[in-house]
Structures are given as C-alpha cells and as structure tokens.
Regions:
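Accessory alpha/beta interaction modules
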Residues: 1-148
C-alpha cells in the first residue's frame, strides 16, 4: 500500500472543494456565496483533540462558508484512508469519532448547522456506516451523517 500523505489529501480537497460540495451536497451548493472564499480551519479542528489519539489514516477538513443570506455555516469533511471496515469494533470507533467531531465543532464555534461527510476509501462497498447511536435506559441519541 502506498504511504499515506496527509498534505496531498488536504491540498486535493482544498483545490477540489467547490466541485466536491456540488457533487456531495447538491442542495447546499447553490445556497453558498462562492464570491467569499471558504475558510479552512483544520488547525483549529486538530487542536480540539488529543494529538496522541489522532491517527495517520484520516484527514479532517473543517470549512467555514457563508450562504447567500449572509449566515455562516460549517462543513466537516472526514476522509478515512484504508484499513477500516474490517470488523464491528472499527465501525463503532469510526461512528463515534464522527459524532465526536460534530459535537466538538458545535461546542467550540457555538453552531448548530454542520454538514458532515465521511469519504471512505477502503473499497468495501458493504461498509458504509452513516450513523452513531447510543441508548441508555430510555435516553437515546442518534447522529446521522453523509457517507461516500
């Protein structure tokens, strides 16, 4: 397997951000004010996590965009590179991590509207988890995210 290169993925996503949003979020795309450049907040996002826990097999992009009505929104792109999808433990870890990104961004920037997309590169078409669920004595939480 070729060596994973975080910077290549980040540059690719930055360069292709607009067509990626058009493809993955066709309803959101025309609402974005593209005359204003998206602000990429990877460094701020990385600071929300313990560096020892951040792996080298995924890339996280947090972009702040403005809609045509002037409101600010956030788009979280998570690229999962190879190796996942082999078992139930991987799935639960991945789903929980997606939820953790969501609630930390929501808490840090005090925002409700976050569009999240997980891009999986593992090649296993049957492994496409799209939600994190937990329940304890009648209290239930379900977080659903986009996956490609």
């Amino acid at each position: 397997m070729p060596e994973f290169n975080d910077e290549i993925w980040k540059r690719s996503i930055h360069t292709l951000f607009r067509p990626m949003i058009e493809f993955h979020f066709p309803d959101l795309y025309p609402l974005i004010d593209w005359s204003r450049e998206p602000a990429f907040l990877e460094e701020e996002l990385a600071n929300l996590f313990d560096p020892k826990k951040v792996g080298k097999r995924f890339v996280d992009i947090l972009a702040q965009v403005f809609l045509l009505d002037g409101t600010e929104k956030y788009i979280l792109l998570h690229v999962e590179v190879q190796g996942y999808g082999s078992g139930e433990e991987d799935t639960l870890e991945f789903e929980e991590r997606m939820f953790e990104y969501y609630y930390r961004v929501r808490d840090k920037w005090k925002v409700k509207d976050i569009a999240a997309l997980a891009i999986l590169t593992d090649g296993n078409e049957k492994y496409r988890p799209d939600r994190y669920e937990t329940s304890f004595f009648g209290t239930t939480l379900t977080y659903v995210f986009n996956v490609s």
